[in-house]
Amino acid sequence: MKAWPVLGIVFVQTILLLAHWFIYHTWIVFWGDMGAWPMLALRAAIFLLAFSFIAAALFGFYFANRWVTMLYRLAAVWLGLLNFFFVAACLCWLARLTLALLGLTTNNPLLGAMFYSLAVVASLYGLVNARLIRVRRVPIQLGGLPASWRGRAALVVSDLHLGHVNGSGFSRRIVELAARLNPQIIFFPGDLFDGAKADATALAEPFRALAPPFGSYFSTGNHDEFGNAARYGEVLTRVGIRVLTNEKVIVDGLQIVGVPNGDSGYPIRLRATLESLELNPGTASILLNHVPNRLPIIEQAGISLQLSGHTHGGQIFPFTWLTRRAFGKFTYGLQRFGALQVYTSSGAGTWGPPMRVGTSPEVVLLTFE
């Protein structure tokens, strides 16, 4: 294993340990000592939970069986609970300080019970909300759009993260949605797979039923590249999804381009790739680029519309706020960068906690006007 993944794991594990310590410390201050045996059990549980997600993720990267899947799902749910327990602990201390400054009596157990209960409610809501895929309908106008495409619809499906949490049943749900929406073309702009060790063939097999008249197209995201991207590509090709790797196809006059996530991150490489494709500036073009980045280069290349995912809209609070600090207005939705239009989808699936709070899972139906 290279040094940087190890350092990343150590960094994340350190953050998780500190978060668990903070929650434990808050529990002690606000509820007090519960006795020798209960406290020993609490410490042991906190210690094991602190390592659960990293351990489950590592197991999930190398092994695929029902026990690993169960461990990963439980650890992922706990990671979401941890997030909201951490927020609850912060609110406990903030409320205690506020009451003290106002000279009011502080009821620590009541404060703790109130905020930690809200954390559980938020987590339960997030679990349910993450399974309710919305259909977002977006009309769009592109300069140079061939007349034959006017009135047609394209389905954009990003960030499924198929693996230990979202299995083949999730794939079937997407196929059923597509059948109901009846798009003429389907785009998968990355992170179709989670990158974990899994049966890619079984996960992708439901997509064989997709039958848009002008085909389905995919370009890799960062999680696809964490796993066996070549294997994923073979599997998708077999079920009828065209994998675009630094290439352009012309579909009934519309230029469709796909760039792998690993290449789009390098400005010089991306610029050279787009130049080599010899795009026709007078005809509409759509780029599948997983991350909503390198927009000056992409606009300069003459791309009409970029389809992205990656951000999940932040997925759960407070990461919704942090993601917007990182990507600005391109965190979500249809935005403009000069002559370039960018649609960033919040995605249909989840990564890590199978929860969504402050965002909604979606597929996007673009209607060309």
Name what the model sees in each region.
Residues 105-150, 154-156, 162-167:
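Canonical alpha-helical transmembrane segment with a positive-inside/aromatic-interface signature
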Residues 141-369:
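Soluble catalytic domains of enzymes that build or remodel membrane lipids, polysaccharides, and related
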Residues 31-34, 47-53, 109, 128-135, ...:
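Short, mixed-charge, low-aromatic patches
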